[in-house]
Amino acid sequence: MKQSLLAKYKNGPVTVTIYDDGTKIREWDDEKYDIEPELEFPESCDVKITNFCEGSFLNNDGLYTVCPFCHEGSSPSGKHGNLEKLSDMIERSNLPEGIEFAIGGGNPLATPGIEKFLETEAKSRNHIINVTMNYNHISPNDGKYRQQTIDYLKRGLIKGLGVSVMYYNLENFLNDKELQDVSSNIVIHIIEGINSFYNVKEKLFNCEWRHPKVLILGKKNFGRYGMLSEDKKAIDDKQTTIWRENILDFLKEFNGVTSFDNLALERLDVLSKLPKEVVDTQYMGKDGSHTMYLDFVKEEYGRQSTSKDRKPIGDKTFREIYKDVYQHRKEWK
């Protein structure tokens, strides 16, 4: 499938180009500027808009319940963020077209006013909205939000879809051709440690989906996960070790596209295993260099979703928050 240009803009010394398959290119004069040059505004904003989730984890009794490893603690009693307030904040921030917003939760498509928000930000303001959903919410069998998701993708309200999977539904998702055909930017979300390395490898390497995209996420040892037994955590830690020991071979053998969040890069020690030229040209930088995190349920912000240090959003703009995050990114916990 041929790439189509979604956005191109200048952010301080950096030229940013984004294509419809999710490819992002950042270019600057590295002889004149640092490896993480200071920008005028954030290029990608991770925004939690809800803590509501009906329950998307299939337990041993065959029932759906809340995910036991959810660091957000999302549940059927979780609260929603105010999307009108978020949209107003985006407008006041005077951001150029093409800024990426990674919208998550909880279940983001259950948030009141979500369609109006997407129409405003994706269509009227031409921002790039990426949404993360649990596959059980959008599966062809009983996924309550499947048609809504497909409709939003076809209408361009969502440009990228991240799909969280587990061992019991990964194969079903890999065979979901209807969903795969809707967009060239559908990404499988895999949590290392939680998901078995060998199960993931077997399913991915033997599926018919050509060049699947995978985002490997670092396991977060807090939130609901922190309440699990030490025995369960020990089992997951062994899985993390297996991921760490085999990740380089996985990258060499996999015929798709693999990316990592910064936590996974750290926990699996990925950067030290890669050639310098690969790191120099493909590593997108640390959290806070051109990104930021908002919890719009609690109306707080931080450097990243795992940040313990949070500050109230108040009446700040995205530009003001980014400046604060960037200037304090090295000491921000």
Language-model features, listed with the residues they occupy:
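Alpha-helical scaffolding segments of alpha/beta enzyme cores, especially the outer helices
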Residues: 88, 113-123, 148-151, 202-203, ...
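Radical SAM enzyme [4Fe-4S]-AdoMet core and its adjacent flexible, acidic
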Residues: 159-319
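Core AdoMet radical
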Residues: 44, 52, 71-83, 96-111, ...
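Flexible mid-to-C-terminal extensions adjoining Fe-S/redox cofactors in radical SAM and related proteins
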Residues: 2-17, 21, 38-43, 293-333
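Canonical Radical SAM [4Fe-4S] cluster-binding loop centered on the CxxxCxxC motif
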Residues: 33-85, 305
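Catalytic domains of carbohydrate-active enzymes, especially glycoside hydrolases
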Residues: 88-98
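Short, flexible/disordered intra-domain loops and linkers
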Residues: 56-62, 139-144, 224-238
